[in-house]
Amino acid sequence: HSFIKNLLLDNLLLVDIYNRAKKLHIEADVRRVVMILEMPQEKDHSSMESVKSLFGGKSKDFITAVDEKSIIVVKELEDGENYPEMDQLAHTILDTLGMGNDGKTHMAYGTIVNELKEVSRSYKEARMALDVGKIFFGDKEVIAYSSLGIGRLIYQLPIPLCKMFIKEIFGGKSPDDFDEETLVTIDKFFENSLNVSETSRQLYIHRNT
């Protein structure tokens, strides 16, 4: 699995990716997606084995890890498989491990890529989805990079710029000073990617309010 780890971490030259893949009989031009399961504490051996058994030892899928708390799945997609199936698979993995609805375990996945060299991008996207998900979608167990909405944009802004904006808009007011109704409205506004019409519809209030 050292090849897959190095591939995920972007440690290989393009020529090495294809040469080593050829030696290991790994197809280069197939659809793949990277999924990351992140646990609140260090994973044990049984968690890794449970995930592996879910995939039935398929040689085309790779299950590995690059740190203590995560299990990474590099999944090869069958014809007809797309994001809805990946979402379903992520929930199945959480349920199989008995970690569904614990509020502490999350699963994220990047975009589907068509070439082996793009696997590291899908991995980076899944990592970002985990981070953004914790900030903007704390109640979600499964987070897709392609569904992050405005959160993906805000997360990539420089922190000093965000602080300047908050100071400019709110002055000396702290978020703790807002009443519950205002906080719910703001939360719903972000949830709907700053769509005023959809936010007002869900809150049953007029958009001008």
Label the model's feature ranges:
Residues H1-T209:
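Cytosolic nucleotide-utilizing catalytic cores of signal-transduction proteins
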